Swiss-Prot record:
Enzyme category, top tier: ligase
EC numbers on record: 6.1.1.12
Entry protein name: Aspartate--tRNA ligase
Pfam hit, one: GAD
Keywords noted in UniProt: Aminoacyl-tRNA synthetase, ATP-binding, Cytoplasm, Ligase, Nucleotide-binding, Protein biosynthesis
Annotated gene: aspS
Region (Aspartate): 195-198
Residues that hold L-aspartate according to the record: E171, R217, H448, R489
Catalytically driven reaction(s): tRNA(Asp) + L-aspartate + ATP = L-aspartyl-tRNA(Asp) + AMP + diphosphate
Any one of the GO BP annotations: aspartyl-tRNA aminoacylation
InterPro entries per the UniProt record, alphabetical: Aa-tRNA-synt_II (IPR004364), aa-tRNA-synth_II (IPR006195), aa-tRNA-synth_II/BPL/LPL (IPR045864), Asp-tRNA-ligase_1 (IPR004524), Asp-tRNA-ligase_1_N (IPR047089), Asp/Asn-tRNA-synth_IIb (IPR002312), AspRS_core (IPR047090), GAD-like_sf (IPR004115)
Biological source species: Vibrio campbellii (strain ATCC BAA-1116)
Amino acid sequence: MRTHYCGHLNKSLAGQTVELCGWVNRRRDLGGLIFIDMRDREGIVQVVVDPDMADAYEVANTLRNEFCIKLTGEVRVRPESQVNKDMATGEVEILAKGLEIINRSDVLPLDFNQKNSEEQRLKYRYLDLRRPEMSDRIKLRAKASSFVRRFLDDNGFLDIETPVLTKATPEGARDYLVPSRVHKGSFYALPQSPQLFKQLLMMSGFDRYYQIVKCFRDEDLRADRQPEFTQIDIETSFMTADQVRATTEKMVREMWQELLNVDLGEFPVMPFSEAIRRFGSDKPDLRNPLELVDVADLVKDVEFKVFSGPANDEKGRVAVIRVPGGAELTRKQIDGYAEFVGIYGAKGLAWMKVNDRAAGMEGIQSPVAKFLNEDVINGILDRTQAESGDIILFGADKANIVAEALGALRLKLGKDLDITKEGTWAPLWVVDFPMFEEDDEGNLHAMHHPFTSPLGVTAEELKANPAAANSNAYDMVLNGYEVGGGSVRIHNAEMQAAVFDILGINAEEQQLKFGFLLDALKFGTPPHAGLAFGLDRLVMLLCGTENIRDVIAFPKTTAAACLLTDAPSLANPAALEELAIAVTVAKEKDAE
């Protein structure tokens, strides 16, 4: 039906007759001539309908926005004075010879010329996707996927599919369960990742695997999470962690170069402990120069228990952030930040303004200065390299609370005060994660997943002191987002059983849940390692947006609902009966 896309027309086609299909973006009637901005997925071109073309003119008179049309016309170069430099096709226009309405449109429930509510956009997503901004994002996603496949194919990786109906495994989030009609009372789980299957593929001899695959997690949502998401899943045999990182870093660097013409440069490598110490996060945004500075040794002997208590607690921490120029913050703003860190468990936010460094104690303004002697204050000022006009913000609590609260505050200050260098890129690798993390009850949990190999210890050494072990894991971080995570995997049954033991999974449960894996590890398993990228998050960054819903064609809401199709919905009672499932809905107790 068409010979060209609207957005591909240029001066080289002058004099040629073209056939276009698309939508009416705008129609204008100017002194007899009718102008139509015609749009398709590749862009917009201006169409001129002259009254001399009687049939086309008659049709053009009836056109309204979003009518689907077919046009036959001649490409002609615009006069220099009429060139539209804001349009890719602005040097040409189409003189209409034939015009056909393929389909009419009702009045749209969305207004493409103003901001629509997200609820309306998701309910009428098929219309929202017509907007050039959204269309460009989906096209960039397609280019990113195509690039990944091409890169991995060229590097000897095999695209292999893994099952979608599988078995539940403990990977940190709740599973989406699918009832079996044949095996009544039993359930499949939709995969949170293809983790075990890709490891089994390594045991099968396919030493370089990849898959762009849908994964599912029934977890609380936020701007960069969805219940179903797309993963670039990669696994290799006989490659070290350094080699896996080098290969995947090359892929991301070349992707940014091809799609954005941006050179990310070589990625720095930072241990987990340094990331937490300096930035309060294992995914630090290095565009933000603010850092956490430890001062526990300076305040451990003060009488102010708010500081000295955590400073003398082996699980406590006292740290500060120096904010250049922050002395201009008002008390109301500081109180707002104190309320903000409270979200993360902090009990308050002590502060110290350095109004005049040269004036000594007279130049300090702080509600806690009276509890600190001059040597302590000078020590803090020297360590943070504070200058006149700065403010110092304190965190004193359990180490994890200080890291989380000040880490989040650091990001907020970066945005609020324009400290973060927007429009730049700051990638890095974070490595040497703890093997396990402890919950409030003192139980150990795998920090990544239970198939991650420990770093440099035997199974016996790991069991003797699991809390001290690091894992051979690595995360790729870009502008404060974890875009990919991976590890060297456990490749012998003894080590895998040891990890399960530490996690409190007894021998019987190991066989029930992971017997197939433990058996497979007995048959000459090669050393293997891998990594998985979140495609949605990568594309979100490529597009310069902050919400992955902007780069998914048909996303869910933060309540995991599809407003377009009204999913999830109640099941047919007959289908439930066939599945031998009875549904009970828990009701909240009436307020007393």
